[in-house]
């Protein structure tokens, strides 16, 4: 428990290994790989609590998270730490210290207003911006279309769950010699978003990767029709890399399970009020 609280209050990170060899690519747009246990067993424990919250009416979610949904300023904090003075979002600037893509639903918890759902058996979709592997679209590679000689490539990932995000990180670990994942204090600890910071480009592999992508998409520039789910590797990445990734993501999901459990206990408290011991513990933890 102390470790969970420490990660929430101080943040957590991991440095991923560099691989000189790019994995065999086979880009297919339109569908994500399905989840499986080898890509994170903790998710399947944590998703049970997410489903409990997913059943709650959204007006109640807004009420109980109003004071703990602080503005997500993690990207700004990363810019400050790395002394990044200028960033390039989707080709909007020709000169920058970093090229950036934010795939997260910044400062949002749910997708649409909704009443309560009777039971988990009646859930047909994930209405929360939490643990939704379908949120990872091919936009995660969009910065590479705009990358010239920037020092950093920075991605705000919408989720850490599923094969898609692990395959993506494995590819980035052959495109850049330094790839780090961070879950900052100033990110939302209600959601499984995180930041990837990559630097020291390995141009040989970047050129190979972009050649494959451009041949599949039949375009040398980014097209908005590419903002879809995708799969990119036929073969699973090696177990060593998966375990290194899970070393980081498990810390995040353990913290989220604790936070979500407190929130659910607060929302279902006998007091029928936002003034209860679970909410007080939650506020103390996150503020």
Curated annotation (Swiss-Prot):
GO cellular component: virion component
Organism this protein belongs to: Monkeypox virus
UniProt-annotated location(s): Virion
Classification lineage: Viruses, Varidnaviria, Bamfordvirae, Nucleocytoviricota, Pokkesviricetes
InterPro entries for the chain: Poxvirus_mRNA-cap_ssu, Poxvirus_mRNA-cap_ssu_sf
Task performed by this protein: Acts with RNA polymerase to initiate transcription from late gene promoters.
Subunit structure: Interacts with the late transcription elongation factor VLTF-4/OPG110. Interacts with the late transcription factors VLTF-1.
GO molecular function, one term: mRNA 5'-cap (guanine-N7-)-methyltransferase activity
GO biological process, one term: DNA-templated transcription termination
Disulfide pattern: none
Domain of life: Viruses
Family that this chain belongs to: Belongs to the orthopoxvirus mRNA-capping enzyme regulatory subunit family.
Name of the protein in its database record: mRNA-capping enzyme regulatory subunit OPG124
Major location category of this protein: virion
Alphabetical keyword list: mRNA capping, mRNA processing, Transcription, Transcription regulation, Transcription termination, Virion
Tagged with keyword Transcription regulation: yes
């Amino acid at each position: 428990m102390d470790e969970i609280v420490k990660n929430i209050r101080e943040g957590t990170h991991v440095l991923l290994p560099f691989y000189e060899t790019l994995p065999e690519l086979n880009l297919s747009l339109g569908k994500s790989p399905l989840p499986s246990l080898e890509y994170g067993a903790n998710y399947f424990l944590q998703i049970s609590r997410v489903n409990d919250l997913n059943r709650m009416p959204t007006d109640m979610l807004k009420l109980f998270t109003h004071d703990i949904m602080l503005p997500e300023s993690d990207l700004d904090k990363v810019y400050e730490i790395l002394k990044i003075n200028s960033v390039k979002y989707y080709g909007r600037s020709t000169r920058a210290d970093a090229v950036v893509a934010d795939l997260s639903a910044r400062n949002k918890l749910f997708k649409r207003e909704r009443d309560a759902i009777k039971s988990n058996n009646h859930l047909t979709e994930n209405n929360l911006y939490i643990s939704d592997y379908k949120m990872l679209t091919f936009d995660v590679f969009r910065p590479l279309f705009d990358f010239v000689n920037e020092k950093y490539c920075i991605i705000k990932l919408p989720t850490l769950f599923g094969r898609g995000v692990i395959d993506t990180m494995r590819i980035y670990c052959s495109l850049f010699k330094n790839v780090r994942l961070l879950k900052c204090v100033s990110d939302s600890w209600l959601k499984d978003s995180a930041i990837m910071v990559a630097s020291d480009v390995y141009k040989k592999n970047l050129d190979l990767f972009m050649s494959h992508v451009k041949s599949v998409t039949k375009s040398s520039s980014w097209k908005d029709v590419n903002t879809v789910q995708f799969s990119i590797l036929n073969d699973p990445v090696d177990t060593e890399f998966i375990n290194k990734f899970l070393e980081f993501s498990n810390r995040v999901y353990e913290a989220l399970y604790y936070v979500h459990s407190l929130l659910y206990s607060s929302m279902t408290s006998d007091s029928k009020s936002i003034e209860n011991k679970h909410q007080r513990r939650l506020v103390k933890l996150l503020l």
